[in-house]
């Protein structure tokens, strides 16, 4: 009995459970005959893991199946391309483009579109630029309005004729609209209310028609202050030397000076009046 047993069968060796050297086959046969599982198999079953050999076999099977599927697809596509006409094949190729290729083709086909203007943030750009933009918009609106009713806009622009009024000894300036008055008399009364320290001779609405140099001198000597004006030529003239309509068109500014200083303007006023007449 002892002679039948080999020492290798009873020899103890250190190693991992289920593994070993030359006695692996005998140990596997003994385990299969005894019906007991090894330590590694027990752990795999508890963790629901497949043995290493089975996992490798499954991976090989999956790779072979995937390769077979690819070969079948290539054969089918090749047969379709042979049967299809060139336009149909091109259309099929266009249908199977990747998303990146289709986006590139679309971008190349469409013309370049301008970017949408950004919404203006309140308070930016700075105030000066913002005001320039507002003025530009208002100018455009003004042009449109002028195109629609140019006669009305021209009449509105000519409706006012503001001129500055100064007086010798007065520390301030005033401004009057000559279009508000219809004669020299109305303008004289308005100036008297503005500057109560001067008097002015009365002139008719026709200016100095029928007035000679002596009458102008008497007018200047009889008043403490005399209104004068600067015309478009830059000459200082006496108020009342021309008809009212001509005065309104040519007056640039008014000055109320002392009568003694305005005496030298009388001959010049008479000369200019004669030349215009």
Curated annotation (Swiss-Prot):
Residues 13-38, 53-119 are annotated as: Disordered. It is found in: Nucleus. Residues 24-37, 84-94 have a biased composition (Low complexity). Induction: By auxin. InterPro entries: AUX/IAA_dom, AUX_IAA, PB1-like. GO terms for biological process: auxin-activated signaling pathway; regulation of DNA-templated transcription. Highly expressed in etiolated seedlings. Expressed in roots and flowers. Residues 64-75 have a biased composition (Basic and acidic residues). It holds the Pfam family AUX_IAA. Residues 160-259 form the PB1 domain. Keywords: Auxin signaling pathway, Nucleus, Repressor, Transcription, Transcription regulation. SUPFAM superfamilies: CAD & PB1 domains. GO terms for cellular component: nucleus. A motif (EAR-like (transcriptional repression)) lies at residues 12-16. Its main location: nucleus. Homodimers and heterodimers. Aux/IAA proteins are short-lived transcriptional factors that function as repressors of early auxin response genes at low auxin concentrations. Belongs to the Aux/IAA family. This is Auxin-responsive protein IAA30. The lineage of its organism: Eukaryota, Viridiplantae, Streptophyta, Embryophyta, Tracheophyta.
């Amino acid at each position: 009995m002892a002679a039948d047993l080999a020492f290798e069968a009873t020899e103890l060796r250190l190693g991992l459970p289920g593994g070993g050297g030359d006695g692996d086959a005998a140990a596997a046969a003994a385990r299969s005959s005894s019906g007991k599982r090894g330590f590694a198999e027990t752990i795999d079953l508890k963790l629901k893991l497949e043995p290493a050999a089975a996992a490798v076999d499954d991976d090989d099977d999956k790779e072979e199946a995937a390769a077979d599927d690819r070969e079948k697809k290539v054969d089918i596509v090749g047969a379709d391309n042979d049967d299809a006409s060139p336009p149909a094949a091109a259309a099929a190729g266009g249908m199977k483009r990747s998303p990146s290729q289709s986006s590139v083709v679309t971008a190349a086909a469409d013309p370049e579109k301008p970017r949408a203007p950004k919404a203006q943030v309140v308070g930016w750009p700075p105030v000066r630029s913002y005001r320039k933009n507002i003025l530009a918009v208002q100018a455009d609106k003004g042009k449109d309005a002028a195109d629609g009713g140019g006669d009305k806009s021209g009449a509105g622009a000519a409706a006012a004729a503001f001129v500055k009024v100064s007086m010798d000894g007065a520390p301030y300036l005033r401004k009057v609209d000559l279009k508000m008055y219809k004669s020299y008399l109305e303008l004289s009364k308005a100036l008297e209310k503005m500057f109560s320290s001067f008097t002015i001779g009365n002139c008719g609405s026709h200016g100095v028609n029928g007035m000679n140099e002596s009458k102008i001198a008497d007018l200047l000597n009889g008043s403490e202050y005399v209104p004068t004006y600067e015309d478009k030529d830059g000459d200082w003239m006496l108020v009342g030397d021309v008809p009212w309509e001509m005065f309104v068109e040519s007056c640039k500014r008014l000055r109320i000076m002392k009568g003694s200083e305005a005496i030298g303007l009388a001959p010049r006023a008479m000369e200019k009046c004669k030349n215009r007449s």
